Amino acid sequence: EMLYKQKIINFRIKNKIIWGLKRVNNEIIKKKFKFNYDLEDIHMNIESRLFELIGEDAGYIHTARSRNDQVITDLKLWLKKATKKIIILLDSTNSNILKLAAKNVMTIMPGFTHLKNAQPISLAHYLLAYVEMFKRDKKKFKNNLEFLDENPLGVGALTGTSFKIDRNYTTRKLKFKKPTNNSVDTVSDRDFVLDFLHSSLVCSLHISRIAEELIIWN
Protein backbone atom coordinates (compact mmCIF):
# COMPACT_ATOMS: atom_id res chain seq x y z
CA GLU A 1 0.00 0.00 0.00
CA MET A 2 2.82 2.39 0.80
CA LEU A 3 4.48 1.69 -2.56
CA TYR A 4 1.21 2.54 -4.32
CA LYS A 5 0.70 5.65 -2.19
CA GLN A 6 4.17 6.84 -3.18
CA LYS A 7 3.43 6.03 -6.86
CA ILE A 8 6.18 3.43 -7.01
CA ILE A 9 3.80 0.69 -8.20
CA ASN A 10 0.44 1.02 -9.94
CA PHE A 11 -3.06 0.14 -8.70
CA ARG A 12 -3.24 -3.17 -10.57
CA ILE A 13 0.03 -4.49 -9.15
CA LYS A 14 -0.87 -3.35 -5.64
CA ASN A 15 -4.19 -5.21 -5.74
CA LYS A 16 -2.62 -8.37 -7.16
CA ILE A 17 0.04 -8.46 -4.45
CA ILE A 18 -2.46 -7.80 -1.64
CA TRP A 19 -4.81 -10.46 -3.00
CA GLY A 20 -1.95 -12.95 -3.24
CA LEU A 21 -0.67 -12.27 0.26
CA LYS A 22 -4.17 -12.60 1.72
CA ARG A 23 -4.53 -15.92 -0.09
CA VAL A 24 -1.23 -17.13 1.35
CA ASN A 25 -2.27 -15.97 4.82
CA ASN A 26 -5.54 -17.90 4.60
CA GLU A 27 -3.70 -21.02 3.45
CA ILE A 28 -1.37 -20.80 6.45
CA ILE A 29 -4.25 -20.23 8.89
CA LYS A 30 -6.18 -23.19 7.47
CA LYS A 31 -2.99 -25.30 7.50
CA LYS A 32 -3.22 -25.82 3.74
CA PHE A 33 0.04 -24.05 2.94
CA LYS A 34 2.70 -26.43 1.62
CA PHE A 35 6.07 -25.49 3.04
CA ASN A 36 9.13 -26.23 0.94
CA TYR A 37 11.91 -27.01 3.40
CA ASP A 38 14.52 -26.63 0.66
CA LEU A 39 13.82 -22.89 0.77
CA GLU A 40 15.65 -20.74 3.30
CA ASP A 41 12.81 -19.69 5.60
CA ILE A 42 9.18 -18.59 5.90
CA HIS A 43 9.82 -15.45 3.84
CA MET A 44 11.12 -17.40 0.86
CA ASN A 45 8.21 -19.84 1.13
CA ILE A 46 5.70 -17.00 1.02
CA GLU A 47 7.50 -15.33 -1.86
CA SER A 48 7.63 -18.59 -3.83
CA ARG A 49 3.91 -19.17 -3.34
CA LEU A 50 3.14 -15.57 -4.30
CA PHE A 51 4.94 -16.08 -7.62
CA GLU A 52 2.79 -19.18 -8.20
CA LEU A 53 -0.38 -17.19 -7.53
CA ILE A 54 0.21 -13.89 -9.34
CA GLY A 55 3.24 -14.46 -11.56
CA GLU A 56 6.10 -12.04 -12.18
CA ASP A 57 4.33 -9.14 -10.47
CA ALA A 58 5.28 -10.82 -7.20
CA GLY A 59 8.79 -9.53 -7.82
CA TYR A 60 7.64 -6.04 -6.85
CA ILE A 61 7.56 -7.08 -3.18
CA HIS A 62 11.35 -6.62 -3.26
CA THR A 63 10.91 -2.93 -4.02
CA ALA A 64 12.44 -0.57 -1.44
CA ARG A 65 13.15 -3.29 1.07
CA SER A 66 15.83 -5.81 1.99
CA ARG A 67 15.81 -9.15 3.73
CA ASN A 68 17.60 -7.35 6.57
CA ASP A 69 14.83 -4.92 7.46
CA GLN A 70 12.10 -7.44 6.59
CA VAL A 71 13.36 -10.10 9.03
CA ILE A 72 13.80 -7.59 11.86
CA THR A 73 10.33 -6.14 11.25
CA ASP A 74 8.71 -9.58 11.36
CA LEU A 75 10.62 -10.49 14.49
CA LYS A 76 9.57 -7.30 16.26
CA LEU A 77 5.93 -7.78 15.27
CA TRP A 78 5.97 -11.33 16.64
CA LEU A 79 7.68 -10.30 19.88
CA LYS A 80 5.26 -7.39 20.36
CA LYS A 81 2.32 -9.76 20.07
CA ALA A 82 3.91 -12.33 22.39
CA THR A 83 4.89 -9.67 24.95
CA LYS A 84 1.39 -8.21 25.12
CA LYS A 85 -0.08 -11.68 25.55
CA ILE A 86 2.34 -12.45 28.39
CA ILE A 87 1.43 -9.17 30.13
CA ILE A 88 -2.26 -10.11 29.97
CA LEU A 89 -1.49 -13.55 31.41
CA LEU A 90 0.57 -12.01 34.22
CA ASP A 91 -2.32 -9.67 35.09
CA SER A 92 -4.72 -12.62 35.14
CA THR A 93 -2.36 -14.68 37.29
CA ASN A 94 -1.92 -11.89 39.82
CA SER A 95 -5.67 -11.32 39.94
CA ASN A 96 -6.24 -14.97 40.82
CA ILE A 97 -3.48 -14.98 43.43
CA LEU A 98 -4.95 -11.85 45.05
CA LYS A 99 -8.36 -13.52 45.29
CA LEU A 100 -6.81 -16.57 46.93
CA ALA A 101 -4.80 -14.39 49.31
CA ALA A 102 -7.92 -12.46 50.36
CA LYS A 103 -9.49 -15.74 51.48
CA ASN A 104 -6.45 -16.79 53.49
CA VAL A 105 -5.40 -13.77 55.52
CA MET A 106 -5.89 -15.72 58.75
CA THR A 107 -4.60 -19.03 57.42
CA ILE A 108 -1.40 -19.69 59.35
CA MET A 109 1.25 -22.01 57.96
CA PRO A 110 4.93 -22.74 58.59
CA GLY A 111 7.38 -20.58 56.72
CA PHE A 112 10.39 -22.44 55.37
CA THR A 113 14.08 -21.61 55.11
CA HIS A 114 16.47 -24.25 53.79
CA LEU A 115 13.49 -26.64 53.57
CA LYS A 116 13.00 -26.47 57.35
CA ASN A 117 10.25 -24.89 59.43
CA ALA A 118 11.38 -21.38 60.35
CA GLN A 119 8.60 -18.97 61.36
CA PRO A 120 4.80 -18.99 61.27
CA ILE A 121 3.40 -16.99 58.37
CA SER A 122 0.04 -16.05 56.91
CA LEU A 123 -0.65 -17.92 53.66
CA ALA A 124 -1.90 -14.62 52.23
CA HIS A 125 1.41 -12.92 53.00
CA TYR A 126 3.27 -15.79 51.36
CA LEU A 127 1.08 -15.65 48.25
CA LEU A 128 1.55 -11.90 47.94
CA ALA A 129 5.27 -12.51 47.47
CA TYR A 130 4.41 -14.02 44.09
CA VAL A 131 2.29 -11.01 43.24
CA GLU A 132 5.37 -8.83 43.71
CA MET A 133 7.48 -11.14 41.55
CA PHE A 134 4.97 -11.11 38.71
CA LYS A 135 4.57 -7.33 39.00
CA ARG A 136 8.29 -7.00 38.39
CA ASP A 137 8.02 -9.40 35.46
CA LYS A 138 5.20 -7.33 33.99
CA LYS A 139 7.27 -4.16 34.34
CA LYS A 140 10.19 -5.80 32.51
CA PHE A 141 7.97 -6.87 29.62
CA LYS A 142 6.32 -3.44 29.43
CA ASN A 143 9.74 -1.79 29.30
CA ASN A 144 10.65 -4.09 26.41
CA LEU A 145 7.73 -2.73 24.40
CA GLU A 146 9.42 0.67 24.12
CA PHE A 147 12.10 -0.73 21.81
CA LEU A 148 9.79 -3.22 20.12
CA ASP A 149 7.61 -0.29 19.06
CA GLU A 150 10.26 1.19 16.74
CA ASN A 151 9.63 0.35 13.07
CA PRO A 152 12.68 -1.04 11.19
CA LEU A 153 10.98 -1.29 7.79
CA GLY A 154 12.53 0.96 5.17
CA VAL A 155 16.15 0.97 6.33
CA GLY A 156 17.03 -1.52 3.60
CA ALA A 157 20.15 -3.66 3.73
CA LEU A 158 22.21 -1.02 5.53
CA THR A 159 21.76 2.59 4.39
CA GLY A 160 18.13 2.92 3.34
CA THR A 161 16.80 3.09 -0.22
CA SER A 162 16.82 5.49 -3.16
CA PHE A 163 13.03 5.10 -3.51
CA LYS A 164 10.92 7.89 -2.03
CA ILE A 165 9.23 5.76 0.61
CA ASP A 166 7.11 6.90 3.55
CA ARG A 167 8.30 5.22 6.74
CA ASN A 168 5.76 7.10 8.84
CA TYR A 169 2.98 5.52 6.77
CA THR A 170 4.25 1.97 7.29
CA THR A 171 4.78 2.78 10.96
CA ARG A 172 1.09 3.63 11.33
CA LYS A 173 -0.09 0.66 9.23
CA LEU A 174 2.00 -1.82 11.23
CA LYS A 175 1.02 -0.14 14.52
CA PHE A 176 4.51 0.85 15.61
CA LYS A 177 4.96 4.09 17.54
CA LYS A 178 7.80 5.52 15.47
CA PRO A 179 10.45 4.59 12.88
CA THR A 180 13.94 3.66 14.03
CA ASN A 181 16.50 6.46 13.87
CA ASN A 182 19.66 4.94 12.39
CA SER A 183 19.71 2.37 9.58
CA VAL A 184 23.11 0.87 10.46
CA ASP A 185 22.08 0.29 14.06
CA THR A 186 18.67 -1.03 13.00
CA VAL A 187 19.89 -3.88 10.80
CA SER A 188 22.39 -5.07 13.42
CA ASP A 189 20.25 -4.59 16.53
CA ARG A 190 19.10 -7.71 18.34
CA ASP A 191 19.07 -6.18 21.82
CA PHE A 192 15.29 -6.46 21.91
CA VAL A 193 15.55 -10.24 21.48
CA LEU A 194 17.91 -10.52 24.45
CA ASP A 195 15.58 -8.30 26.49
CA PHE A 196 12.65 -10.59 25.73
CA LEU A 197 14.66 -13.73 26.52
CA HIS A 198 15.91 -12.27 29.80
CA SER A 199 12.42 -11.22 30.89
CA SER A 200 11.06 -14.64 29.94
CA LEU A 201 13.84 -16.42 31.82
CA VAL A 202 13.27 -14.46 35.04
CA CYS A 203 9.51 -14.98 34.77
CA SER A 204 9.98 -18.71 34.20
CA LEU A 205 12.11 -18.92 37.35
CA HIS A 206 9.27 -17.39 39.36
CA ILE A 207 6.79 -19.85 37.86
CA SER A 208 9.20 -22.71 38.58
CA ARG A 209 9.48 -21.53 42.18
CA ILE A 210 5.72 -21.74 42.64
CA ALA A 211 5.67 -25.25 41.17
CA GLU A 212 8.54 -26.37 43.39
CA GLU A 213 6.95 -25.03 46.56
CA LEU A 214 3.58 -26.59 45.77
CA ILE A 215 5.38 -29.93 45.41
CA ILE A 216 7.11 -29.44 48.78
CA TRP A 217 3.84 -28.50 50.48
CA ASN A 218 2.23 -31.67 49.17
Annotate the PLM regions.
Residues 137, 187-218:
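Glycine-rich anion/phosphate-binding loop at the beta-strand->alpha-helix junction
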Residues 1-160, 165-171, 178:
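A helix-coil-helix interface module used to build multimeric assemblies
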Residues 99-100, 174-176, 189-190, 210:
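Generic detector of short, locally flexible boundary/turn motifs and exposed helical patches
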Residues 180-185:
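A structural signal for small-residue-enriched, beta-sheet-centric alpha/beta enzyme cores
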